[in-house]
A protein has these predicted regions:
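Bacterial N-terminal signal peptides that target proteins for export
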Residues: 1-10
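Bacterial N-terminal signal peptides
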Residues: 9-18
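Gram-negative and organellar
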Residues: 27-30, 34, 44-766
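N-terminal signal peptide c-region/cleavage motif recognized by signal peptidases
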Residues: 20-22
């Protein structure tokens, strides 16, 4: 019915256009000229499957649409202008832009954008009733077995849409009173609302538990303010700018009823300190804090100057404050649990980032280019330390964990130096040599306090002819990691000694961001135009990361991306283009089981890959994406009929192969490592577009769009409201285990679909 109405309105509009006298390209109104364009039409379509992926970030209606609207008013004296344009007017992904001002003096702009984000509107369901951040149940399972939970959730769950709406408004002003002075200001506001999947947990860890997957309420408001001024003199400039970002979370706390406490509903429910899912006791509800409201302020001073000996300087200095002081929630909402002690009621979060950038470029010597750069960034965390002398409550049940903790405000500082020299060896060859140094300093609680990384390598630009270009570059990176010590985390776990902390984290474990690393990076690009109407291009990027001193953790990471493409215009009215890209990522890591038991390696002190090969497992991952694009542009009849065809295809896959952790380790309850099911997705797109120019100001547009998507992901495709028979089929008929007593949204993510969409429209210029 929707597309029939669209076709009827389009036919009426087309008839009126034929009957009307075409307008000139612009309209004179006194001292002003007015020009613009409007496009309107309909989008009949046929869709099948799960369309959440199709409309993930866009709105594709089956009604009349206005894809584009443009208006421009210009003064004949060239002292005033006004521009207005919009895209997809009235849709969920619409945008508007209004700009006006006086040439050379003032420019004012207002922009409005809407961006939808669709997670799932097809199969997510929940038994919870929501009131802002409060999730309540109007009923509970008849018993505490997994079968009771299954029957209850299937009977009481209601559909819920998982999607977000982003509304962004921005107002910009630029004022130039003199050729030297420029002042600017802007204000932006972003509102994000909606719901997305969010998992919560009640029960000890480790131990029995129950999960409830909720539709998390999202209601964020962010304000961004920017003010600045700049003066440009003869050969120099200086500017000062202020930025502010104010974030407010309108729903900062999440509270939910516990389906496994069967003592009653609402106020009739009785809290218990002991969590016993079989008996239906424990906390009546759970509670957690969401993202806190916060603010950031930054001052930026920047400048540039032309110096003697053909030298140019560019520099910037910034200093800021990031502040957050949201009150802490009590440790638990469970009234049967005694609240532990805490030293503060809020964090008083205070981070002072400092940044210095300085660059010198010199071209004094003929055919020689020199460049030196320095960057310093200091993340100075002045937040207060918080003491938990008795530890904390685990998931609203039981007693404190008894581990004395003292928070540590992590800080770091990073310095970078870059030196580059280039030389025009010949008319067709330019060679460049670069060196870089990076020093990272971390606060005491991190495993590695200081690391240095050196990089060096050449770049060559080769242009043997006017129609041929080759660019090759290679860079070698070497990062050290001396004095890696996991025991430094005792600064947080103050009830433990450094030796205790080292044992609990395994001596051989290295975190990849702090581990010694060797990196090789190679890049190649070429562009060849053997004919005036033919251009070929290609490239290859390769990065190889190795972690030579890592036994437990990431050991290797390789990625490479070859690409090919062409543009060919065999005829004046015909052009053909094509591209192929392949990206591949390979990684390897090694891990070791930490559980102890009879046989094998019962002590963490002796638990190494060499001593316990049977308890060690290896994982090898491979991710790759193939993308193909082919198309053509045809001007069949000049200034009358244009055609466009384009086809796109992509194929992506992700594999994880695992081995090891065999029963020979002797550990009780051992689960051998197994391969993860391969994730695969395919995407096809075909576009056909025709433009028939009825008059220089009137054109008819016809289009067809085909889009197909398929995906196979075992971790998502199997999701249902209740997963007990999927996780442990042998636990039936009662399924009285943790997953059997858990509930989910049943959100299967972005399922497969096919869509055929037409477009019938008219574009009118005036």
């Amino acid at each position: 019915m929707g597309y029939r109405k669209a076709i009827l309105l389009l036919s009426m509009g087309t008839t009126l256009l034929f009957l009307a006298t075409p307008s000139p390209a612009q309209v004179d109104l006194g001292d002003y000229t007015v020009s613009g364009a409007i496009e309107a039409g309909g989008m009949p379509s046929h869709r099948s499957g799960n369309t959440s992926k199709l409309e993930e970030y866009r709105d594709l209606p089956e009604t009349v649409v206005v894809p584009q609207l443009e208006l421009f008013i210009d003064s004949k004296k060239k002292d005033f202008y006004l521009e207005f344009d919009s895209l997809k007017t009235g849709r969920d992904d619409q945008s508007y832009r209004l700009r006006t001002g006086r040439y050379g003096l003032v420019d004012v702009e207002f922009v409005w954008d809407q961006i939808p984000h669709l997670f799932n509107v097809d199969n997510a369901r929940t038994p919870f009733n929501r009131d802002d951040g409060r999730y309540t149940l109007s009923s509970k399972p008849a018993g505490t077995t997994g079968a009771n939970v299954r029957d209850w959730v299937n009977a009481n769950a209601q559909p819920v849409d998982l999607k977000l709406y982003n509304g962004l408004a921005r107002f910009n002003v630029r004022y130039t009173p003199t050729p030297g002075w420029t002042f600017s200001g802007s204000y932006g506001s972003q509102n994000t609302t909606g719901k997305r999947a969010f998992g919560v947990y009640i029960g000890p860890s480790p131990g029995s538990f129950n999960i409830s997957e909720l539709a998390e309420p999202i209601d964020y408001q962010t304000h961004n303010i920017e003010l600045g001024g700049e003066y440009a003199g003869q050969g120099w400039s200086l500017g000062l700018k202020y930025n502010a970002s104010l974030f407010h979370n309108n729903v900062s706390t999440l509270t939910w009823d516990n389906p496994l406490n069967t003592t009653g509903l609402g106020a009739a429910c009785v809290d218990s300190a002991a969590y016993n899912p079989a008996a239906g006791t424990g906390p009546c509800r759970g509670r957690l804090d969401l993202y806190p409201s916060n603010q950031a302020h930054t001052f930026i001073l920047n400048g540039a100057a032309s110096l003697p000996f053909k030298t140019n300087f560019i520099g910037a200095f910034s200093y800021g404050w990031r502040l957050q002081n949201d009150p802490f929630l009590p440790f638990t909402i469970n009234s049967a649990v005694i609240q532990p002690t805490i030293s503060r009621r809020s964090l008083d979060g205070d981070v002072r980032p400092t940044m210095i950038n300085a660059t010198l470029v010199n071209n004094f010597f003929r055919d020689v280019g020199l460049k030196a750069s320095y960057r310093y960034y200091d993340f100075d965390n002045r937040s207060k330390r918080v003491l938990l002398p008795d530890g904390f409550i685990v998931n609203d049940q039981g007693v404190t964990n008894g581990t004395e903790l003292l928070s540590f405000p992590y800080s770091y500082a990073k310095q970078n130096i870059g030196l580059d020299a280039s030389y025009n060896v010949a008319r067709w060859l330019t060679a460049k040599l670069g060196y870089g140094w990076e020093r990272m300093h971390r606060e005491y609680a991190r495993e590695l306090l200081n690391s240095n990384e050196h990089s060096f390598g050449p770049t060559f630009d080769i242009k043997p002819t006017a129609w041929t270009l080759f660019r090759l570059s290679y860079r070698r990176f070497l990062r050290d990691a001396h004095d890696y010590d996991a025991g430094r985390n005792a600064a947080v776990e103050i009830g433990e000694t450094p030796e205790d902390v080292r044992l609990s984290r395994l001596e051989e474990l290295r975190k990849f961001d702090q581990a010694a690393r060797q990196r090789d990076r190679f890049s190649f690009f070429t562009q060849i135009s053997p004919l005036e109407n033919l251009t070929l291009h290609g490239g290859f990027d390769f990065t190889n990361d190795r972690y030579p001193r890592t036994v437990i953790g990431v050991q290797k990471d390789i990625d490479y991306a070859p690409s090919l493409g062409f543009i060919y215009a065999p005829l004046e009215w015909l052009s053909i283009f094509g591209d192929y890209n392949w990206e591949r990522f390979d990684w390897r890591m090694q891990a070791i089981a930490r559980n102890t038991g009879p046989g094998g390696c019962p002590d963490l002190e002796l638990r190494t890959a060499e001593n316990c090969p049977a308890a060690t497992w290896r994982s090898r991952g491979n991710d790759e994406i193939h993308t193909v694009k082919l198309g053509t542009e045809m001007q069949v009849v000049k200034n009358l009929l244009n055609l466009h065809f384009q086809y796109g295809f992509s194929f992506g896959s992700s594999e994880v192969r695992s081995s090891g952790n065999s029963a020979a380790s002797g550990d009780t309850g051992l689960v051998p490592a197994t391969d993860y099911p391969t994730i695969v997705n395919r995407w096809h797109e075909f576009i056909a577009r025709l433009e028939y120019i009825l008059h220089k100001n009137v054109s008819l547009k016809l289009g067809y769009y085909f889009n197909s998507y398929s995906s196979k992901d075992a971790g998502v495709d199997l999701m249902r409201l209740w997963m007990g028979d999927v996780e442990t089929p042998a636990a039936g008929p009662n399924f009285s285990n943790s997953i059997g007593r858990s509930i989910f949204l049943g959100d299967r993510g972005k399922g497969s679909y096919q869509a055929h969409i037409g477009f019938l429209g008219v574009r009118l210029k005036f």
